[in-house]
């Protein structure tokens, strides 16, 4: 009986090879399907176990493509990273996490993920992806996708049709210069947006509608001003290494959730900072290092960490930290960095000790 089954399988193989083109990808696809389409079960007849092939009419079941690993300990994950792949392999329907980073992939065609609607995590970073070679409906049938990693590629624009389910989007270290207003439309679940190290000059109103966004990273771009229409729930804003020279007066007062602001390595001057722009009680950390400041800006007594190193500050003004100095009024500042300025220890007035009594780290 076993001999007849083997003969039948060989006959099928010969028939396939004579009727199909010799294209290597077709042959590889055939081998994959043959390797994984035969699931065997046990049936009992007269207390004797026997193996039987499942019905040939059933569709093939592909547990894992040959190019990847799908470890039994992580049954919903597919690892295809660091394999010199030039295309996205077939993704089985049960997969939720697919890792395709560190390959040579340049193109993503429409339909490549359609078989896996439960995908929640796609890592495609550190490839050679080109915006012109990404289909406009690649992500159209992924209603459960939450995290998408596209950093370290050759993207010149935001891909079309991003799922509204996304919570974490990484597109840093690309060549994106402009972001159309509709790029993130309807993405009300997005909480973290990473756009650092691109060539963005202006975001316009592209961030409107991102009601859940709490982290926005725009480091290393070409921004000349702080983006307008910042989301209301934003708590972390990273703008270092840009070309920003001024700050709007209501920049922080209209965004009570903003806790951490980093504006180092810009072109800020005291003339571009309104008197009370940073004097808001909700701010926890402010980084203004490596700018062109000559005076310490006025800050709230609630601020805990202030970084002002590598500016041109010549004077230590206690009133920048405490409007009134006594036993009941003092700053909550813990960390103050003023090194690489023009202030000397003897320039600090004695009342500064009372004002900054909670500080544990002051660098001059």
What are the roles of these predicted feature ranges?
Residues 1-82, 94, 102-104, 118, ...:
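Terminal targeting and flexible regions in eukaryotic proteins, enriched
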Residues 59, 65-70, 76-77, 87-89, ...:
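Plant-biased, solvent-exposed loop and capping regions
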Residues 77, 97, 107, 121-123, ...:
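Conserved LRR concave beta-strand detector
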Residues 83, 103, 124-127, 150-153, ...:
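Consensus "Asn ladder" position of solenoid repeat domains
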Residues 86, 106, 130-135, 156, ...:
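Leucine-rich repeat
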Residues 90-92, 111-116, 133-142, 159-165, ...:
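A structural signal for leucine-rich repeat
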Residues 106, 113-208, 212-215:
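A generic tandem-repeat structural signature
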Residues 207-212, 217, 221-262, 266, ...:
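WD40 beta-propeller repeat blades
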């Amino acid at each position: 009986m076993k001999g007849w089954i083997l003969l039948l399988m060989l006959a099928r193989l010969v028939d396939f090879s004579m009727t199909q083109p010799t294209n290597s990808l077709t042959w590889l696809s055939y081998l994959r399907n043959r390797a994984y389409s035969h699931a065997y079960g046990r049936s009992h007849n007269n207390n004797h176990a026997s193996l039987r092939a499942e019905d040939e009419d059933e569709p093939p079941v592909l547990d894992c493509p040959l190019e990847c690993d799908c470890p039994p300990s992580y049954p919903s994950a597919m690892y295809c990273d660091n394999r010199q792949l030039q295309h996205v392999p077939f993704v089985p329907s049960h997969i939720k996490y697919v890792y395709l980073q560190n390959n040579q992939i340049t193109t993503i065609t429409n339909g490549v993920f359609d078989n896996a609607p439960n995908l929640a995590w796609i890592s495609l970073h550190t490839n050679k992806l080109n915006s012109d070679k990404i289909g406009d409906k690649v992500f159209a049938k992924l209603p459960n996708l939450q995290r998408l990693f596209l950093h370290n590629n050759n993207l010149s624009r935001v891909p079309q049709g991003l799922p509204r389910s996304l919570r974490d989007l990484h597109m840093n270290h690309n060549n994106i210069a402009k972001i159309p207003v509709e790029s993130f439309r309807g993405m009300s679940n997005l909480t973290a947006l990473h756009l650092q190290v691109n060539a963005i000059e202006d975001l316009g109103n592209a961030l409107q509608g991102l009601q859940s966004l709490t982290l926005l990273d725009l480091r290393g771009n070409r921004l000349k001003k702080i983006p307008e229409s910042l989301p209301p729930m934003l708590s972390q804003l990273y703008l270092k290494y840009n070309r920003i020279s001024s700050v709007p007066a209501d920049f922080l007062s209209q965004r009570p959730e903003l806790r951490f602001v980093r504006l180092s390595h810009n072109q800020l001057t005291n003339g571009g900072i309104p008197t009370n722009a940073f004097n808001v009680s909700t701010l926890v950390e402010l980084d203004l290092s490596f700018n062109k400041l000559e005076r310490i800006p006025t800050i709230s007594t609630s601020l805990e960490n202030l970084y002002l190193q590598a500016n041109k500050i010549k004077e230590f003004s206690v009133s920048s930290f405490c409007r009134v100095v006594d036993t009941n009024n003092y700053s909550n500042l813990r960390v103050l960095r003023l090194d690489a300025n023009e202030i000397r220890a003897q320039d600090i007035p004695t009342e500064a000790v009372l004002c900054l009594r909670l500080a544990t780290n002051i660098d001059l």
